[in-house]
């Protein structure tokens, strides 16, 4: 162990009673022998300016490494650690007033006053003893590969007047400090001060040493320094009291600098690092993405526990229900999250789509009327070539000609109805499968409705879509009793005095309705609602009655009657198939097979 001797001359004796204690050899149990303070030999016994060992002992209960400490009245330096033992023995023999002091389990490197070196000398030095101009220049442990960071003067261990951070002996010393077991008391290890008299080799030191008894744990982002290891080590200033202690507690550099590690930089949901606010609350990127996905997908979570699962950085992914509930509890706003239709449109809200003119009720009504007029024969081009008003009915079984006429009238009407349907706004946008399904399902109903509206039941005239005019008796053998039901429906329909726009809307509603097997029933329903609204507005404007709803209800009441007449038509086709006089056309046969209710 290095030998430490005073390098000053004999100063004036200190008047304090502790400075006059004899340097007796202490036992390993750290007990001091009693002595008479009034003895005249005690005054010049220790004429050195080094701190008394009672200062070391007060407040410290740890173990000390054993080494010899020689107090000498002369100022002869010892040059190496190997000459310490011989110097101690010779000094004991020549100076009876001085005594050797032995400590157990305690090591001190460079913690004694001496000449302070500048920052350049401190960098070039390799031992802790050189920094203070110690007479004993024994090298201290160091780590050559470690490069100390460039810190400010007060961010180092002891500032520019302290050993470098490569000094590992200091860390070993701090690890041997005892744990505080009781109420914290102000520690007082040793306080360095210059000798009473001015010394040319010692400059006033601005440092006070108050090592903490509790180990200081470094926070995230902090570097190891004496300020963090020993918070009590603070520079003395005129603002401090005589003891060199601060009146207020010393805060760490992390709290003073407002680092992101503070509470304002933490996620309000899980406590992770958060750089900015998301959806109204400071949150991390993980909680922001979780909240966004949950709102956009409208996800529903279930808690497998008691809905009070802990949500922190480590356990935030365990329960999605509790995590989302905490997001709402801390104030995250769901309405701020953009929906799928707004992705990629920052700073813009969707403008209200302007209703195109072709989808307006007036334009829809005009299109329906035009489609109806184009699909029907004009009154100036009716074909009366086969009309026989006075023809006698042929009672008995129908022949092949009557059955073939029946099939031809049905097949011709199907092509006209198909062309009419293609002119209805919105029908062409439906899928081809839905178009065929709607046409085949509503064909017989449309055939009956259109025939009944064009015909003149009072005169017994039946006007078909091709312009052919036949008398009721001419159709009796082919249509059977079904023709009489059609004429009865025609009379009831004409009694309502239905104009062309209302009839065009009613015909479209017969086609555009819900059918079993539709691929896009939603689109069919939307188109049906538009046509129904158009019909309602027209009837309300043209009826001229106090209660226009009654006229609309009577008009819509004809739709169930059409279903009944459609069933009678299927029965007639089935009967003709059983007679097997003429094979039905493929399109009629397909319609029959697809629309059978059984």
Swiss-Prot record:
Q: Where is this region: Required for the interaction with RXRA?
A: 299-361
Residues carrying Phosphoserine: 341, 351
Q: Where is this region: AF-2?
A: 584-595
Recorded GO MF terms: DNA-binding transcription activator activity, RNA polymerase II-specific; DNA-binding transcription factor activity, RNA polymerase II-specific; double-stranded DNA binding; lipopolysaccharide binding; nuclear glucocorticoid receptor binding; nuclear receptor activity; protein heterodimerization activity; RNA polymerase II cis-regulatory region sequence-specific DNA binding
Where is region (Required for binding NBRE-containing DNA) located? 268-354
GO CC list: chromatin; cytosol; mitochondrion; nucleus; transcription regulator complex
Cellular location(s) = Nucleus; Cytoplasm, Cytosol; Mitochondrion
Q: Which residues bind DNA?
A: 264-339
Is Transcription there in the keyword field? yes
The protein's matches in InterPro entries, at most eight in alphabetical order, are given as: NHR-like_dom_sf, NR4A1, NR4A1-3, Nucl_hrmn_rcpt_lig-bd, Nuclear_hrmn_rcpt, Znf_hrmn_rcpt, Znf_NHR/GATA
Q: Any keyword Kinase? A: no
Note down the stretches annotated as region Disordered: 1-43, 128-151, 341-361
Q: Which UniProt keywords apply?
A: Acetylation, Cytoplasm, DNA-binding, Inflammatory response, Metal-binding, Mitochondrion, Nucleus, Phosphoprotein, Receptor, Transcription, Transcription regulation, Zinc, Zinc-finger
Biological processes, Gene Ontology terms: cellular response to corticotropin-releasing hormone stimulus; detection of lipopolysaccharide; fat cell differentiation; inflammatory response; negative regulation of cell cycle; non-canonical inflammasome complex assembly; positive regulation of transcription by RNA polymerase II; regulation of transcription by RNA polymerase II
UniProt domain NR LBD: residue ranges: 360-595
Where along the chain is composition biased (Low complexity)? 134-145
Q: Where do the segments described as Binds lipopolysaccharide lie? A: 521-544
Q: How is it modified after translation?
A: Phosphorylated at Ser-351 by RPS6KA1 and RPS6KA3 in response to mitogenic or stress stimuli.
The record's annotation in SUPFAM superfamilies points to: Glucocorticoid receptor-like (DNA-binding domain), Nuclear receptor ligand-binding domain
The free-text cofactor remark is:
Binds 2 zinc ions.
Which cofactors? Answer: Zn(2+)
How does this chain assemble? Binds the NGFI-B response element (NBRE) as a monomer. Binds the Nur response element (NurRE), consisting of two inverse NBRE-related octanucleotide repeats separated by 6 base-pairs, as a dimer. Interacts (via N-terminus) with NLRP3 (via LRR repeat domain); the interaction is direct, requires binding of NR4A1/Nur77 to NBRE-containing dsDNA and lipopolysaccharide, and leads to non-canonical NLRP3 inflammasome activation. Interacts with GADD45GIP1. Interacts with STK11. Interacts with IFI27.
Question: Its family?
Answer: Belongs to the nuclear hormone receptor family. NR4 subfamily.
What is the purpose of this protein? Orphan nuclear receptor. Binds the NGFI-B response element (NBRE) 5'-AAAGGTCA-3'. Binds 9-cis-retinoic acid outside of its ligand-binding (NR LBD) domain. Participates in energy homeostasis by sequestrating the kinase STK11 in the nucleus, thereby attenuating cytoplasmic AMPK activation. Regulates the inflammatory response in macrophages by regulating metabolic adaptations during inflammation, including repressing the transcription of genes involved in the citric acid cycle (TCA). Inhibits NF-kappa-B signaling by binding to low-affinity NF-kappa-B binding sites, such as at the IL2 promoter.
**Domain free text:** The NR LBD domain binds the lipid A moiety of lipopolysaccharide (LPS) in the cytosol.
Q: What is this protein called?
A: Nuclear receptor subfamily 4 group A member 1
Lineage of the organism: Eukaryota, Metazoa, Chordata, Craniata, Vertebrata
Q: Which gene encodes it?
A: NR4A1
